[in-house]
């Protein structure tokens, strides 16, 4: 079933709705029992829409993911499916290929990415005798890199251990290329024309935020029905275009937010050179070229494990 009802109608003013392919999502920030009631009302409106269009949701596939530290509110609120069954909350949910956990980190997803890349790397090394740089780079870029890049703007880790573990995947592969076995990792990356994986993830964050402020992709919605990504200073200003960074208090969840795309990505964007930040009315490929020229001037020194 494909959900094609837009979220701009009055019937769904309490929550946000989104749809992709056969998946439909409905969400609401819950701060009280009244918020929970409003979310259930919006769920009923979605069920009613499906019934009026001779369609129905599969209640078996309903998934509920809760974020936040208010355990009392979590335990005292329930939501029901179109069949009247209680929707059970889950510790993690896979959405469009990304595993999201109720503790608001991506440890489980990163672990799955690492396991998948290790399997693909082992398959490549078993299946191909040649270790020539050209062949190995074609295999790495076409088979493995897409798994490491997919949605990395969202799950980009900030824990040193996770950054090192991910970087070790590429380091291991580079060491298996003919002529690069004993070469320093950073030197090998330059000769092979590769970025470190950490640099790749940061690069994609900058590209995505540029796409948002250029209007090429939708903005990130905030809880007060406003856009989360906002331009702080314009191109005409002395320092060039920058993104506004909201102040945050200390705490566990604030730390996670501090390292998320709207905050960490915004700091990266603001740290770029003025010609990168002021690039406008360009194609994405043209912006990537400008960004890459600027990144060449910044040392690419990722965190590495001590073992090979």
What do the predicted segments below correspond to?
Residues 31-39, 104-113, 127-138, 156-166, ...:
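Conserved, non-catalytic sequence blocks in retroelement Pol enzymes and Pol-derived host proteins
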Residues 41, 56-92:
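Short, conserved micro-motifs composed of acidic
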Residues 24-51, 157:
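Catalytic palm subdomain of template-directed nucleic-acid polymerases
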Residues 160-308:
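Short linear motifs embedded in intrinsically disordered, charge-biased segments
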Residues 1-3, 39-42, 113, 120, ...:
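Hydrophobic alpha-helical membrane-association signature
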């Amino acid at each position: 079933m494909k959900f094609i009802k837009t979220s701009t109608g009055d019937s769904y003013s309490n929550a946000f709705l989104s749809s992709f392919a056969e998946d439909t999502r409905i969400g609401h920030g819950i701060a009280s029992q009244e918020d929970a009631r409003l979310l259930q009302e919006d769920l009923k409106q979605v069920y009613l829409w499906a019934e009026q269009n001779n369609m129905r949701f599969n209640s078996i596939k309903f998934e509920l993911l809760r974020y936040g530290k208010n355990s009392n509110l979590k335990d005292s609120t329930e939501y029901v499916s179109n069949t009247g069954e209680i929707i059970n909350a889950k510790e993690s949910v896979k959405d469009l290929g990304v595993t999201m956990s109720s503790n608001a980190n991506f440890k489980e997803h990163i672990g799955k990415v690492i396991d998948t890349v290790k399997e693909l790397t082992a398959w490549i090394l078993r299946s191909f005798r040649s270790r020539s740089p050209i062949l190995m780079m074609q295999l790495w870029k076409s088979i493995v890199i897409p798994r490491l890049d997919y949605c990395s703007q969202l799950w980009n880790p900030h824990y040193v251990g996770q950054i090192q573990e991910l970087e070790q995947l590429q380091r291991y592969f580079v060491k298996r290329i003919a002529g690069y076995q004993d070469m320093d990792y950073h030197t090998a990356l330059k000769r092979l024309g590769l970025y470190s994986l950490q640099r790749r993830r940061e690069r994609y964050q900058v590209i995505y935020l540029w796409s948002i402020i250029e209007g090429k992709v939708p903005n990130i919605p905030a809880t007060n029905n406003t856009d989360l990504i906002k331009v702080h200073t314009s191109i005409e200003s002395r320092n060039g275009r920058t993104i506004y960074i909201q102040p945050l208090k200390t705490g566990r969840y604030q730390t996670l937010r501090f390292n998320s795309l709207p905050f960490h990505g915004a700091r990266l964007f603001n740290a770029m050179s003025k010609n990168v930040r002021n690039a406008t009315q360009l194609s994405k490929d043209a912006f990537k070229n400008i960004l890459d020229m600027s990144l060449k001037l910044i040392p690419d020194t990722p965190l590495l494990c001590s073992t090979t």
